[in-house]
């Protein structure tokens, strides 16, 4: 549990960010903190304490407490704390540096990419100006050391002078994952060839030529990715190709409205039957959980596109594209289901545990969403919609889907935060830093017997996009970051039994055992002496 005492009062977002910062620190130290209560005291001269900008500081403080190490009190840090220990940007940077100087501090740690940042000043007419400043000028003005730190690892090093968590080995991809994803890619790319053959007699005009060229281009990318061994990327490209080929095939069939409705009915039945099969699967590992998430999401998405088909019957071209997409989404779901029942470290995945994980993740998103909306009130409507879907899943008891959608929504917000105030020519650096963190997380998860298939899949896809589309790569690296360490929300079914013993003070345990042995020995001696006295007494008689 987390207890927070503040003066003055604090807003909810600070309470949430404190809880999340604690979780990140516990994960960073690889310690199960579920048996400990954490008490934090925050005092300030401001009218109210708000925002998540103390997240990095709280994580450093919590880390030092857990590891029982001293840190340099002449150092200060500001920044949000995000999945994987990534330190995110904050507002009011100039004022914070000035405050650190007044307090006599020697070093200030700030988020990466803020060499030039902006201050937001609000006026009565809700107009704002962007006042830029150069941190090099502040360094000279105050003679204070200002250092950019991208991760919690780097911040801890600046506070302690020690490195505690570095990537030990290169990432080893699970052979089960590799074999299964390879088979998934083969299935989807083989379907591309099959669908392509269906349109051999296609009448080509300007419109269909564009569709055909796109389908062929995606299919070619799928084959190239497969030959390079990046099977998730291959499967993704072939899925896109399949949608285009299927759409072209449907166009040339000239289906009547009744025939379209009949196809919709058949597909709905197919979804229902397959969904029942999936519900019977037992979720034991992170791989199972993420497989279940992605399969259910695809089935739900297919169902939604079938709704769109029925709503757009008067627009033949639109409803046929939606029909093609729904069909391919179902096929994709069936392919992903092959990841269910993979081996790995087992966790306690009862409904209550997953519900709590979902609620925690929703709280994390809300905290960040409120913060970002202070600067971009109109630009996150899609994320808000995704979050609303997650809340609906929570209400309906679909906790796995809720966790999945909330994780993706959080990645959306974190992606905006990660480039907020970052110059365009620094985006590649931010992306590489995120990918590096994801890779390290994946290495550590693998060492723990966990292989997050979605985390790795998105990591692979982000790498394939980083040169051609760095902003999309940032988003997918965010998905990878969120979905590569879901285990921090769950307890290992085996670990609980081990921790039960580990939580006992070993010295007290040894003393207890020694006491029991001495007690038994004393009883034996007493009993022996008693018998001896009895024999002497009888001889005297």
Residue ranges, per PLM feature:
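Peripheral, non-AAA+ core regions of ATP-driven protein-machinery
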Residues: 1-223, 252, 268-296, 300-303, ...
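Juxtamembrane/start-of-transmembrane alpha-helix segments at the extracytoplasmic/lumenal side
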Residues: 497-513
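Alpha-helical transmembrane segments
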Residues: 515-531
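Hydrophobic/aromatic side-chain positions at a characteristic register within alpha-helices
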Residues: 219, 226-227, 233, 306, ...
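Membrane-proximal extracellular "stem/stalk" segments
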Residues: 330-334, 397-501
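Cytoplasmic C-terminal tails of single-pass
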Residues: 530-541
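Long, low-complexity or tandemly repetitive, helically biased scaffold regions used
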Residues: 250, 258-363, 367-370, 374, ...
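TPR-repeat structural position
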Residues: 231-232, 238, 316, 323, ...
